[in-house]
């Protein structure tokens, strides 16, 4: 099973390790991803920084090259496509999966899983929260490009689709459903997932990794007979691929610094660009604990 993650900005790989992050998507580069030893690779599309039209063109180009590579090689393993998006609901959340479905589909369903457990960004009863605060009450909702007024993911997805999908056709997989879920054929939730078709849109509640693991195990069983697409934040990727991030020491990261011929560390440059308050706090902490000069 190979997981292909099309990432809308550079942070999607933060919960995994030991996989390729492709900065280009020509056919020869994509082939390296498919032939890599890892069951997972990322394509950095960076579409969150693009207009709707340019984002769609980029995703379409990536998809066409993916189809070319896949058709030219007889890959025996299942391929699962993941559109990695923001855990604070910014970005082209409907447009990008829609473009993927048009080019690589048709899919039986698209699952929306914006939970980022490490950042306390959770989906409960269909609404999204940051550290228990409804997402529409946070600074992220005031984004000048991707702002929104609701924490209800179903309502937001419908609004972002510009009525291309019916509100009633968007389904929820609630925590109570996941509690009941198992991979037995007679399980009522399992059967509901198995019967999804015509690219149903399903919003998945998540508040911890055990729920993600249970969902991921069922998906891996169903994927042999169903064709599913995913629009998710980073936590689902580590769950489904079983490649959780590895904690590293300060010595490990310091060894990544570039050295000169005498093996002394060369100076580096840190560029920070964000209006989010958390980034300001992180920058101030960096200036306090290091010899960085602004």
Feature names for model-found ranges:
Residues 22-25, 294:
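Short beta-strand/loop segment at the start of cytosolic alpha/beta domains
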Residues 20, 45-46:
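N-terminal domain-start signal
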Residues 7, 44-45, 114, 206, ...:
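Pocket-edge structural micro-motifs
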Residues 3, 38-42, 110, 200-202, ...:
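Hydrophobic beta-strand segments of well-ordered beta-sheets in folded domains
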Residues 219-294:
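Acidic, glycine-rich loop-and-beta core segments that form the ion-binding/anion-interacting portion
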């Amino acid at each position: 099973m190979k997981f292909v993650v099309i990432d809308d900005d550079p942070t999607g790989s933060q919960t995994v390790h030991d996989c390729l992050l492709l900065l280009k998507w020509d056919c020869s580069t994509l082939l390296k991803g498919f032939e890599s030893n890892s069951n997972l690779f990322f394509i950095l599309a960076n579409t969150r920084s693009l207009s709707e039209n340019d984002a769609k063109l980029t995703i379409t180009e990536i998809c066409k090259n993916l189809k070319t590579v896949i058709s030219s090689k007889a890959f025996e393993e299942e391929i699962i496509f993941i559109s990695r998006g923001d855990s604070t609901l910014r970005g082209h959340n409907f447009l990008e999966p829609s473009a993927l479905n048009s080019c690589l589909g048709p899919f039986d369903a698209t699952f929306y899983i914006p939970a980022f457990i490490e950042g306390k960004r959770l989906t409960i009863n269909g609404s999204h929260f940051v550290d228990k605060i409804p997402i529409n009450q946070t600074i992220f909702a005031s984004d000048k490009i991707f702002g929104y007024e609701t924490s209800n993911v179903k309502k937001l997805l419908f609004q972002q689709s510009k009525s291309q999908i019916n509100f009633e056709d968007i389904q929820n997989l609630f925590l109570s459903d996941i509690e009941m879920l198992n991979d037995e054929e007679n399980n009522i939730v399992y059967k509901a997932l198995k019967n999804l078709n015509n690219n149903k849109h399903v919003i998945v509640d998540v508040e911890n990794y055990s729920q993600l693991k249970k969902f991921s195990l069922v998906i891996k069983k169903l994927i042999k007979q169903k064709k599913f697409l995913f629009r998710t934040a980073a936590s689902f990727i580590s769950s489904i691929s079983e490649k959780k991030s590895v904690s590293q020491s300060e010595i490990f990261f310091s060894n990544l610094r570039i050295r000169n011929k005498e093996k002394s560390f060369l100076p580096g440059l840190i560029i920070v660009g964000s209006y989010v308050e958390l980034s300001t706090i992180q920058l101030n902490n960096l200036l306090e604990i290091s010899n960085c000069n602004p």
